Amino acid sequence: MQKNDVVKVTIEDIGVNGEGIGKIDGYTLFIKDAVIGDVVEAKIMKAKKNYGYARMMQIIEPSKDRVEPKCKFARQCGGCQIQQISYEKQLEFKNRKVLGNLERIGGFSPELLEKIADPIVGMEIPFHYRNKAQFPFGKDKNGVTVTGFYAGRTHDIIANTDCALGVEQNQEILETILSFMEQYQMEPYDEKTGKGLLRHVLIRYGFTTKEIMVCLVINAKKIPHCEKLVELLQKIEGMTSITISVNQKNTNVIMGDSYEVLWGQAFITDYIGEIKYQISPLSFFQVNPVQTEKLYGLALEYADLKGDETVWDLYCGIGTISLFLAQNAKQVYGVEIIPQAIEDARKNAQINGIENAKFYVGKAEEVLPGYYADYAKAHPGEQAHADVIVVDPSRKGCEESLLETMVQMQPERIVYVSCDSATLARDLKYLCGNGYELVKVRAVDQFSQTVHVETVVLLSRK
């Protein structure tokens, strides 16, 4: 096979990034946007010795699992990778991905996984689920100001104010801002020259409260005719907070370091279950509140709290899981590296009248071992103990030093919430080699139409 060869291929499998996989005489091709069962014509773009990457030129025979994407930009945009696959098959793919990693990397037998894994938790309506969206502003090739999303692996903006994953209110907000910019001849930011005013617009929406936040990220200290823009935006139903964030750095980082209120509050509020959260422009908050409630419900069920337990919640963010757990535990300790998130966590505990949650700023892999060592010094002959430990790390998973301390603290149960089943499998292998057994596994579709999947597992001390 050589570059620019055009081939006919049947798609037999799906890769971890959602790409179709087909074979020609044992030579493997990865083809973006192809679906298992498709017969396609594809042009080879990059040819290695045993495999290559090809671009789909046309679908000769569509798969029975192929659907028409809801969004007309699904193929160009980098936001959704698998919108062309039926939702039932998306769920199948994600479940298989999780269990495959647990078997291949974790070394767990298919028989065990079949016995302990519950079906993936899907969505009733797998669209318009995101409570947060960040829209870049720029110019198209005709010099017209546009907003939308970046095309995959580029910084070219695809003009689209109606994302199928975002809430419908986004469209009215973006069109209001675009027409204001046109009226006052305001320039969007240009990455190449570093000139222009508006860089991004961040929109947050409270699914329960219906409150809206708009944060305008600008390449200046203020917006000319700002009062007019505020007047237009505050007419939109649900508008609660309008802020600006100044970012004058030549960087890909979206937000500036701080923000200033132009109108309304500095935050919006929303609920997960019965817990109320304050969310600022810089807060980390799960983007899919419908599935988050199910995800945390599972974590709580697996923790199996009776009311007298001491619980550690590592990588706790703004205390979302901690506050859920605190309703049913004696004491919860939350650890998070981002100081702003811990401020939010403490504030959220106060708002909800929760007094049995204590939060620490720092790296989980430093705070927990540090606490364990300090406890041993202060209580000779004793060791720090936790009844339950909950972890929800980033994609890189947990460092071994942290896993080691977790094992030393001898919790009866460990609940691991993961956004990367490969690092989850690696960490479970360590824990199950050091006195724990895998009891339950369940995937949760937190990011429909994309390849990402969350997993919740329960480990029990042998």
Predicted features, each with a name:
Residues 202-206, 211-222:
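Carbohydrate-binding surface patches
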Residues 2-8, 16, 221-462:
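Rossmann-like S-adenosyl-L-methionine
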Residues 118-126, 191-192, 200, 204, ...:
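Short, solvent-exposed loop/turn elements at beta->coil junctions and helix N-caps
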Residues 20-25, 148-151, 215-217, 345:
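Short, acidic/hydrophobic/Gly-rich beta-strand patch recurrent on exposed beta strands
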Residues 57-69, 75-188:
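Extended interfacial segments that mediate partner engagement and assembly in macromolecular machines
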Residues 1-73, 358:
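Terminal RNA-binding accessory module
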Residues 127-131, 210, 451-452:
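A short, glycine/Asx- and small/polar-enriched loop/turn
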Residues 157-199, 220-246:
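Internal alpha/beta scaffold segment
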